[in-house]
Amino acid sequence: MNHNLLEKHAKTFYWASFFLSREISQKCSSLYNFCRTLDDIADDTNKLNIKKNNFSAFKKDFLNKNFDNPIIEEMHSIIDSENISKKVVIDLFDGVETDLEEKVRIKSKKDLLVYSYRVAGTVGLMMSKILKVENKEALKGAIDLGIAMQLTNISRDVIEDKKRNREYINHYKHDLKTGCIIFYKIYLQQIHN
């Protein structure tokens, strides 16, 4: 179990892990390591064909249960112990694969939500399983929270993503500008009242 990745890349999650049992904390850390590995493959600065090869190899190792890789072994252990659907993990792979193109262009709100579900809603769902959540409404909430966190990350990383030739919200510039103007007017009203 490597908490170092969690501590290095996800400080908030690392500190939150102290409030969990050791077993749950280890499972959360293993899930993080798996997701981080996929994310690192997608964000690698190598040439696209190398990234695609690394992604394909990791996915193949996952599907073939290549337990020579401890990250894959730990992920399969979580899938089995927490009854996580393999489809959820495949959805995660599909989402990450979206980022393995020369140009990433999300063209509709529906596509943006599907992408966000795949790369983050799935993680919320898997975390819920690890945390023993059984309430179906809470599971839906976990998916929605994952999507919301992804949309927040996309909004935060617009410039960085543009440098990587990824445009998730470019088609919504007018909507975003209008929303910001409305928010700013509401803000001004609040401080002047």
Residue ranges and their predicted role:
Residues 1-193:
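Acidic catalytic motifs of isoprenoid enzymes
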